[in-house]
Swiss-Prot record:
It is found in: Cytoplasm. Belongs to the CsrA/RsmA family. A translational regulator that binds mRNA to regulate translation initiation and/or mRNA stability. Usually binds in the 5'-UTR at or near the Shine-Dalgarno sequence preventing ribosome-binding, thus repressing translation. Its main target seems to be the major flagellin gene, while its function is anatagonized by FliW. It comes from the Bacteria. GO terms for molecular function: mRNA 5'-UTR binding. Homodimer; the beta-strands of each monomer intercalate to form a hydrophobic core, while the alpha-helices form wings that extend away from the core. Keywords: Bacterial flagellum biogenesis, Cytoplasm, Repressor, RNA-binding, Translation regulation. Its main location: cytoplasm. InterPro entries: CsrA, CsrA_sf. This is Translational regulator CsrA. The gene is csrA.
Length: 79
């Protein structure tokens, strides 16, 4: 792991198009901003882990393709 020291309003570049900015420092809390292209997902680690867990659960379900078609039909009827 690369460890860098930064002060408020200083930044770190990752590649050519991702910038991490130190927005504010108060006590033991650091606020950071992330400037990245829209196609790059940015999540807090705990949120990312939850997303991964939910994706694993969803991948393990046994939904039949014909059931998905029926679900789509229900949505069409309501509009």
């Amino acid at each position: 792991m690369l460890v860098l020291a930064r002060r408020s309003n200083q930044s770190i570049m990752i590649g050519d198009d991702i910038e991490i900015v130190i927005v504010d420092i108060k006590g033991d809390q650091v606020k950071i901003g992330v400037k990245a292209p829209k196609n790059v997902s940015v999540h807090r680690a705990e949120v990312y882990k939850e997303i991964q867990e939910e994706n694993k659960k969803a991948a393990g379900t046994n939904i039949k393709p014909e059931d998905l078609g029926k679900l789509g039909d229900l949505f069409k009827k309501k509009t």
